[in-house]
Design a protein with these regions (language model features):
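Conserved active-site tyrosine of GNAT-family acetyltransferases
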Residues: 141, 146, 168
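Conserved hydrophobic/aromatic "anchor" residues
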Residues: 14, 116-118, 146
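GNAT-family acyltransferases
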Residues: 1-99, 162-163, 170-183
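Conserved GNAT acetyl-CoA-binding A-motif
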Residues: 119-129
Length: 183
């Protein structure tokens, strides 16, 4: 059962059946280069289960992203480091399969998590960090309304070169203006 539902994707709580899918996809080089900024070792099913189902973190909301027609698990989206006093959180998202990227699922998932964060949690700001070479993700974030707030220069070493990490943010009032303008 979807917790939140958009036109093409919905969010659900994690189920054990999704974990094996994640474990298989964890070595997709294109996905991996944008998800992690450090050397990785493979996670087993138990580690993925701890990360998703037994998350045990009170300051994180983690949802499975499902395609609405097929109910196929296509990725995850999270709000982490949720701060009640400052009303902020960090956004993370992954669309697992290469053929599912570029289909608008990421845009809709980011829009849905913003709706959840601003309407349901009453957050003031959502932050994210993205590799400077991840142009597809940057396009999605800017299309949703995120603004570049800073650059962590040469913070990431990838393919023999130093890359910047861009820091983005969106305020509740900015998001509400965008939603109002679209309706």
């Amino acid at each position: 059962e979807n917790v939140l539902k958009g036109k093409h994707v919905g969010f659900s709580h994690f189920r054990e059946e999704y974990i094996e899918h994640i474990a298989k996809q964890q070595w997709d080089n294109e996905l991996l280069r944008h998800l992690s900024w450090d050397a990785l070792h493979p996670w087993g099913l138990e580690e993925w289960k701890d990360f998703t189902i037994n998350k045990g973190e009170d300051d994180r909301f983690l949802f499975a992203i499902l395609e609405n027609t097929t109910e196929e698990f296509i990725g995850w989206v999270s709000l982490s480091d949720v701060q009640l006093k400052n009303r902020g959180a960090n956004l993370g998202i992954a669309i697992l399969q290469k053929e599912q990227r570029g289909q608008g699922y990421g845009f809709e998932a980011v829009s849905l998590i913003c709706k959840f964060a601003f309407y349901e949690l009453g957050l003031h700001k959502i932050r994210l960090a993205v590799n400077s070479n991840n142009q597809n993700a940057i396009h999605v974030y800017e299309k949703v309304g995120f603004k570049k707030e800073g650059i962590d220069r040469e913070a990431l070493f990838q393919d023999g070169q130093w890359l910047d990490i861009y820091n983005y943010g969106i305020l509740q009032k900015e998001w509400l203006q965008i939603i109002k303008a679209e309706s």
